């Protein structure tokens, strides 16, 4: 499946909740959910119905995929890796998604959205343990130090994102030095540290276990 390049706010409307895909816009009155909280499309207002069974599992998977901006193939690979790990598969899956470099940069406040954080990583602005890393899907481990490269410390996008997210504290599992544009992963994220939206990862496990 190709990456979605249409209007981002349609994805939130399709899931019926804020997925926080547009940074500061999601916290303003311009948010599409605030203005048109119904399924997009000509007959969107008339299509509301109770979803059960497979449909509920599918919507939960799509919701998480959209939050983290991953393709179906990437998502399935992440699930298969989580299934091989010790512990609860659903929690392993969410933890691995949260440990992606683009997600960590977003959590540190150096991107107002995961999409912007992904762009920051791809453009080569980030070092991991002193070495440049431009792979958004790279998994970050406990003890890893993430820094904005010296040549990028005056980057307008990063500085603007840092200022825009000053009101949002970093999660407990990341120690962030906002002025120094760096941070360190202190522990693995716990279930309560994960995404801002309400979700049931067990439905995803049931979907892929069929």
Swiss-Prot record:
A family per Pfam: Ribosomal_S4
Cited SMART domains: Ribosomal_S4 (SM01390), S4 (SM00363)
Record function comment: One of the primary rRNA binding proteins, it binds directly to 16S rRNA where it nucleates assembly of the body of the 30S subunit. With S5 and S12 plays an important role in translational accuracy.
Species of provenance: Solibacter usitatus (strain Ellin6076)
Subunit and interaction comment: Part of the 30S ribosomal subunit. Contacts protein S5. The interaction surface between S4 and S5 is involved in control of translational fidelity.
GO cellular component, one term: small ribosomal subunit
Keywords attached to this entry: Ribonucleoprotein, Ribosomal protein, RNA-binding, rRNA-binding
GO biological process, one term: translation
Domain of life: Bacteria
Gene of this entry: rpsD
Domain S4 RNA-binding residues, every copy: 99-161
Protein family: Belongs to the universal ribosomal protein uS4 family.
PANTHER family the record matches: 30S 40S RIBOSOMAL PROTEIN (PTHR11831), SMALL RIBOSOMAL SUBUNIT PROTEIN US4M (PTHR11831:SF4)
Protein name: Small ribosomal subunit protein uS4
Gene3D superfamilies for this protein: Ribosomal Protein S4 Delta 41, Chain A, domain 1, RNA-binding S4 domain
GO MF annotation: an example: structural constituent of ribosome
């Amino acid at each position: 499946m190709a990456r979605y390049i249409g209007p981002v706010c349609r994805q939130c409307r399709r899931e019926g909740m804020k997925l926080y895909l547009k940074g500061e816009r999601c916290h303003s009155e311009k948010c599409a959910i605030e203005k048109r909280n119904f399924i997009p499309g000509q007959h969107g207002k008339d299509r509301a119905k109770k979803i059960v069974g497979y449909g509920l599992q599918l919507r939960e998977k799509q919701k998480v995929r959209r939050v983290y901006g991953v393709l179906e193939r990437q998502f399935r690979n992440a699930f298969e890796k989580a299934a091989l790990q010790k512990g609860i598969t659903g929690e392993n899956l969410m933890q691995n998604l949260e440990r992606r470099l683009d997600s960590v940069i977003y959590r540190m406040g150096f991107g107002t959205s995961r999409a912007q954080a992904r762009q920051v990583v791809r453009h080569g602005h980030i070092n991991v343990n002193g070495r440049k890393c431009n792979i958004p899907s790279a998994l970050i481990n406990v003890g890893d130090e993430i820094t904005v490269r010296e040549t990028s410390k005056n980057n307008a996008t990063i500085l603007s994102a840092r200022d825009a997210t000053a009101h949002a504290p970093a999660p407990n599992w990341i120690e962030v030095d906002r002025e120094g544009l760096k941070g360190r992963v202190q522990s693995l994220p716990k279930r309560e540290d994960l995404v801002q939206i309400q979700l049931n990862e067990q439905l995803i496990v049931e979907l892929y276990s069929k």
